[in-house]
């Protein structure tokens, strides 16, 4: 969805039971908040659903969606991403960001040289990761979204500043002076 007025807050991972409930995966910091952001819409905005969380289940919630009455209706929605109006989401502290706000920002190194852009943001459990894209960058370059690696995020200016770890791009070589060759120990 290219609509900046909406943010993806969850996805339907399938049906739950035989009464039209869906299995809902929440992308919210507080997962149960997904039910409080008002009607949620599909990516294209063609469908809008009122969400009622019925109970927690493995990897999400069982939920009833308005207009979904049968298991077949729920099965048909598998993989559907749900979007909330940006105005319904809480404002964040200065050091927190919505993933959607980071995608597309220009990435600069600490010397002010343009490296590329933020292609996506992911979190697989150990913290946020930025995927960078741009000329001269390896395809799918991933960096940790930590204060040490990304000391500056300026949404208003449309940029992030990255202190790139040695060895990730270009001719940088990691410092291996404190490592022994494979199979040997330091004395």
UniProtKB/Swiss-Prot annotation:
PRC barrel domain spans which residues? 94-168
Instruction: Write out the GO MF terms.
Output: ribosome binding
Establish whether keyword Cytoplasm is in the entry: yes
Q: Where in the cell is it found?
A: Cytoplasm
- One GO CC term on file: ribosome
BP GO annotations: ribosomal small subunit biogenesis; rRNA processing
Positions of the UniProt region annotated as Disordered: 167-187
- Function, as annotated: An accessory protein needed during the final step in the assembly of 30S ribosomal subunit, possibly for assembly of the head region. Essential for efficient processing of 16S rRNA. May be needed both before and after RbfA during the maturation of 16S rRNA. It has affinity for free ribosomal 30S subunits but not for 70S ribosomes.
Partners and quaternary state? Answer: Binds ribosomal protein uS19.
PANTHER family according to UniProt: RIBOSOME MATURATION FACTOR RIMM
User: What family does the entry list?
Assistant: Belongs to the RimM family.
UniProt free text on domains: The PRC barrel domain binds ribosomal protein uS19.
Q: What is this protein called?
A: Ribosome maturation factor RimM
Organism from which the protein derives:
Jannaschia sp. (strain CCS1)
